[in-house]
């Protein structure tokens, strides 16, 4: 397709502003590793919250949502909507603990909580496991989406897309560090929101669609609009709702939705002014991420079922797209080619914004692990601040090149999502309990990481999967994930009680620094100390329940409003307001003062 001059002006202007921000903050960011990775720990809640939202926009997210909606309907999004429980657990229980820990990365936590050689090994291994392996997988999926957008909208080859995107993003990331990422995220948030909303409004009202009512009553769409799965279809109900709600949210490690907090979300919490700002940032993120942001993508996905009802129709419209990249996730990019001049430039700028924001975050996050938790711990403990920053910049380049190579081999966003989800299945409960139960040790985590990875790979091998899972096998396909969780959990519990506990002095030091409280520490600090310190978790759980009601009601209220059912939308909005009122009534009980 041809891009008009106005669109190019919008895109180039945006890129120029972005690179200018990186250039302005580059001198300050290069002073030391704390500035480069955490911006001096002085960020306000609203800026960090917006950064969290912008970071998770990502070019692959609308593609993933489109893939889900076209295959499983709107209700299929429960596979990630359920992570709201994980997010709110981080908000009301873990955000202040992370900020009080005062670590540079969440991986540094390991040598604070555990002791001896196992702790040192776990810190170094986890740094490479998450910062390199998982990080490259995630970035590969993001770059895959960029390749598909480049092929459909700009007529670029995969190598051209990766080359152009890589030069701009890596240049920005190595210059500005974390501060550059966060400052640019503030701009990216508004550009990306405007682009996604504008695209959804225009595309739904195209003559081919005929408006929202014509869309939701179209034969290709009518059975896809429900926000809940069909309760009469047992298999669909179990797969789309029961397993995510009963098992997935607490058991799986997924970037941006880590049980107990972690990754680039933890990086932003650690950069906050104090624990109150850390909590405010994560609450704002969860409201925006789940209640409002998905709907523009969902509407475009539904509209794509009218214009491109199947993969064959996409292939017919875009014959230049390579066959190995064809899939339902391509429908989002295909729909964007229908946009008019001006709006197309804004949307392309928003997609570039999403790509740069997410990749920059992943690069800075991964580099922080490599520098703080591997290089300075395992290779060069006496490294100067300048050396740390230089290694961080070199790591940024290498991580991107590895993810770019992977992107050229990938084909589908949903397949990668499912694989990453299963690869970390069963480890989540450890990340939740390790703050509150003294008996968990380094071997608990080591065993869980290895068993989860090995079992998930085995279960995805055809020779094993065909025997255990499927219509004619021992168990239905949807039992694959719960079985990985069950096996992993049993193994790490056995290992925990079969290995000695951590050194008591280390446990006492950890408790005094973070003060998690609760009965799980009674054997270490004594009953009197537990009573004296108090325990905010019960109040936190109440806050979680109220916030769940508020955000899910806002999510559904927005959907019903779009569908034209104003009565149900109004009722849900009223319930959300009541939940919000009681949530802020108990605000002081969890010692949170954001404003």
Tell me the role of every PLM-derived stretch.
Residues 1-595:
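Membrane-embedded helix-loop-helix hairpins and adjacent transmembrane boundary segments
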């Amino acid at each position: 397709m041809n891009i008009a001059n106005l669109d190019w002006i919008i895109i180039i202007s945006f890129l120029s502003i972005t690179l200018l921000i990186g250039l302005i903050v580059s001198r300050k960011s290069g002073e030391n590793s704390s500035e480069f990775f955490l911006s001096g720990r002085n960020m306000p809640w609203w800026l960090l919250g917006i950064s969290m939202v912008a970071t998770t926009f990502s070019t692959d997210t609308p593609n993933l949502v489109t893939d889900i909606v076209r295959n499983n309907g709107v209700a299929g999004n429960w596979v990630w909507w359920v992570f709201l429980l994980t997010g709110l657990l981080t908000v009301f229980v873990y955000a202040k603990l992370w900020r009080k820990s005062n670590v540079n990365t969440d991986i540094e936590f390991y040598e604070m909580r555990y002791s001896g050689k196992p702790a040192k090994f776990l810190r170094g291994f986890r740094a490479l496991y998450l910062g390199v392996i998982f990080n490259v997988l995630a970035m590969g999926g993001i770059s895959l989406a960029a390749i598909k957008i480049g092929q459909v909208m700009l007529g670029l080859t995969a190598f051209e897309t990766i080359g152009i995107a890589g030069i701009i993003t890596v240049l920005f990331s190595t210059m500005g560090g974390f501060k550059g990422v966060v400052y640019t995220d503030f701009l990216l948030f508004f550009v990306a929101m405007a682009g996604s909303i504008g695209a959804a409004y225009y595309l739904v009202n195209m003559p081919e669609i005929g408006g929202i009512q014509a869309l939701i009553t179209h034969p290709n769409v009518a059975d896809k609009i429900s926000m809940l799965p069909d309760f009469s279809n047992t298999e669909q109900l179990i797969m789309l709702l029961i397993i995510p709600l009963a098992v997935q949210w607490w058991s799986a490690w997924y970037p941006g939705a880590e049980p107990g907090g972690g990754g680039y979300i933890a990086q932003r919490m650690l950069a906050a002014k104090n624990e109150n700002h850390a909590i405010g940032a994560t609450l704002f993120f969860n409201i925006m991420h789940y209640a409002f942001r998905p709907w523009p993508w969902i509407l475009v996905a539904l509209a794509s079922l009218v214009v491109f009802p199947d993969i064959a129709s996409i292939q017919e419209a875009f014959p230049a797209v390579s066959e190995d990249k064809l899939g339902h996730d391509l429908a989002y990019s295909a729909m964007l080619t229908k946009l008019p001049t001006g709006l197309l430039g804004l949307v392309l700028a928003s997609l570039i914004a999403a790509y740069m924001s997410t990749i920059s975050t992943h690069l800075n996050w991964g580099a922080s692990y490599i520098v703080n938790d591997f290089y300075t711990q395992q290779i060069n403990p006496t490294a100067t601040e300048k050396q740390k920053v230089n290694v961080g910049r070199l790591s940024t380049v290498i991580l991107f090149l590895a993810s770019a190579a992977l992107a050229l081999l990938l084909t589908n966003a949903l397949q990668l999502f499912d694989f990453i989800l299963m690869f970390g299945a069963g480890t989540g409960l450890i990340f939740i309990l390790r703050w509150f139960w003294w008996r968990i040790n380094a071997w608990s985590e080591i065993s869980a990481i290895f068993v989860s990875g090995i079992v998930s790979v085995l279960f995805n091998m055809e020779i094993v999967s065909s025997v255990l899972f499927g219509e004619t096998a021992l168990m239905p396909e949807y039992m694959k994930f719960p079985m990985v969780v069950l096996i992993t959990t049993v193994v790490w519990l056995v290992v925990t009680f079969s290995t000695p506990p951590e050194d008591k002095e280390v446990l006492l030091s950890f408790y005094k620094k973070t003060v998690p409280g609760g009965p799980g520490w009674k054997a270490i600090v004594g009953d009197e100390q537990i009573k004296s310190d108090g325990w905010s978790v019960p109040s936190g759980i109440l806050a979680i329940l109220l916030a769940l009601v508020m955000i899910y009601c806002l999510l559904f209220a927005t959907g019903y409003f779009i569908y034209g059912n104003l009565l149900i939308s109004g009722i849900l909005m009223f319930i959300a307001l009541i939940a919000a009122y009681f949530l802020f009534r108990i605000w002081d009980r969890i010692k949170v003062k954001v404003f």
